[in-house]
Amino acid sequence: MKFNTITRILLPVLCIVASQTTFAEEKAKNIMELDTVTVYGTVENPNFENFSKAGSVSSRAMNVNAMQNLDSIVRSVAGGYTQIDPGQGGVSVNIRNMSGLGRVNTLVDGVPQTQLGTSANGGGKFHTDGNGPMSQFSTLIDQNFLTRVDIAKGYNNGAAGLNALAGSANFKTIDVEDILLEQHKVGVLSRFNYGNNDLGKNGMIALAGKVDVLESGSLGSLLAFSKSSISQNYRRGNGTMASDSAYMQGLKNHPESYMGKIAFKPNQDSEFKLSGRQYKNSLVGRNIDSATYSLESSYRPQSDWIDLKFLTAVTETKQDFHDDAKLWTLEDASTKNKMWMFDLNNTSRFESGKLSALLTYGVNLMRNKYSRDLPESKNNDGAIRNAAFGPAGKQNIDSLYLDTEWKYGIFTLNSSLHYSRYQLKGYKPECDSDDMDYCFPSFGFDVNKKHYKLNPSATLAFQVVDWFQPFVSYKQTSRSPNVQEMFNTSRNGLSVNPFLKPESAKTYEIGFNIHQDNVLLNNDILGLKAVYFNSRIKDYLYNLSLYGCGPTVCRNSSDATNAIQFQIYVNHPEKVKNRGWEVELAYDSDAFFVNGSYTRTESTAPTSKGATILYGFGTEAYTQLPKDYATLELGAKLLDKKLTLSSIFKYTGKAKRVGIDLDEDGNIIHEQLPNIPVIIDLYANYKVNKHLTLKVGVQNVMNRNYLDALNAYNSSSSEEYDSDTDTYRFTNSARGRTYTLGAEVRF
């Protein structure tokens, strides 16, 4: 393993902690041991926490079953989904038909993820039959480092709710306490997973130590390394191989990740934590290198008025394209995204008679910069000026927020007020001479665009009885245009739109929670959440093609009077309607458990031309969710709960893809995917002892042939064309029956 910066910093700390272990364990013998307290729904199923919270919130635990990937876990959330793109190496969360930076605020340990990945198309390694590059915002994180994900739909408190139109998803990584066994000061956590049918393998090892310091403090640290082998040359349910499709070649990759943390508690009132995480991969014609460093602290003295939290972080992600890889005709390209954030907030609590209140107020700053390098020595000047690749610019967001919770009797009112200042900086090039008639302004200039948004929200809940809580809410959210939208470079200055406005949404929700224990059996627990939501989105941003039509522009290619054609982002003149139902169910007992979710949704959001690969450059993804979808997990606990058996049923309703070709007017065609069957997975976990857990599984037990909804390759321009039906076939089938095994070792 390569000793990088994280290793050099943390290894000495681990050694110091280990040297103190003997002394600490001797001291621990004098500490009184308390009786064991059983807490339901905090580790195996963290979602139980949300059945007593008003609003659309969900949580999922990670790494419970062997080789159950992040896409499957997030898609089990009502209202949640993912955009699948095997060429990006990350996870892209979709909430209520929305995805991408600002529409969904995706975070890791509270740090926003701003990476935009772009795959190559040249060099014979990828898209060998002409499929173009594809781009997608995604989160580069190793699943083995994760413990849970918390998803808020529609709105979230604090920094997670800033610049988040449809919601947020926060992935939580392992801490020292997740590695150490009870009363141990040094520990190791190791995971290994393997799947046949080219699912691949992955492994992780994490070392941690913790020692008492000063009078009531502690010093802990961890160092973790993970590596995977991933490929897409699998056998489909119909017996064919994925590699039979040329666009599925060149996807084998070996990502590796490092993570380190140092946590110092000088006393019981305060804590400081320094974290570092690095992700490296070589995928689809480019090297990816992403690093995040953060410092967080908290201070909570014996006062109801002070609960101070601080977080600052910097993330830098680089993409360097291989010498033999191309983006359309571009060579030797590279991109860099650097993000810095700062958040400071305090929580105050007070009571007056029957009224209790909680107020959280804070400030949040984010600086987000994108840059690219296209060497003039290797690229034609015209190709550089008209490259639909890696727009450059800066995005600054400054925010103030106030979140409150008021409780009086059976009533709970959660209210928020978020104020944000959006700023976009970049350069609008001068328009080409042929484009002057349609370009405004036609000259080149530096753009410095500012917008301001004030978003109030409120949720009122009624605790009618101990187990039943209905609630209603009104939420306003917004998001800034992204650099890639305002400074789109597909046709030099003509495709840049410096007049874009932020998106804003008004969302109404009505729902209820049921949360009760001892329902059917002693020590069982039941949770149910049902929510209806209705959103109206103003100034929705999307990408369209425009054509030269005499003295003006038009949207239909059949009306064009010259060869002028360009793509540009605009604000939709009509309000986008987004509505649906979300239901989540969880039941747990000593003998068996049930987890379920159901989503039904519809949206009038227009599809961006950029979602088409051949004609729209693949600059973004198609995000319309299936009409409805559901996940049901049934499980049993045997042998004194050492053996857990579970079956997962995944239902997907009618789903679409963006057509590979366009209609006669040059507009997007939406095509219905073939009916997707119910997919069944089986898993078994056996806890040999506190040190060893063995895992096995079978994915797609019935070996069904189907397409995953919202898979970017469903619309690959390299799909086979059927001349008899004048359509492109659906050949991007998912993985057939696959066997998995895994082990988790702790000591």
Protein language model regions, located:
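C-terminal beta-signal and adjacent terminal beta-strands/loops
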Residues: 116, 478, 538-539, 543-545, ...
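Periplasmic-side early beta-strands and strand-to-turn transitions of outer-membrane beta-barrels
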Residues: 185-191, 195-288
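Membrane-embedded beta-barrel scaffold of Gram-negative outer-membrane proteins
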Residues: 192, 308-323, 471-475, 502-571, ...
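Short acidic/polar hinge/loop motifs at secondary-structure boundaries
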Residues: 111-153
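Extracytoplasmic beta-strand/coil segments of soluble accessory domains associated
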Residues: 71-122
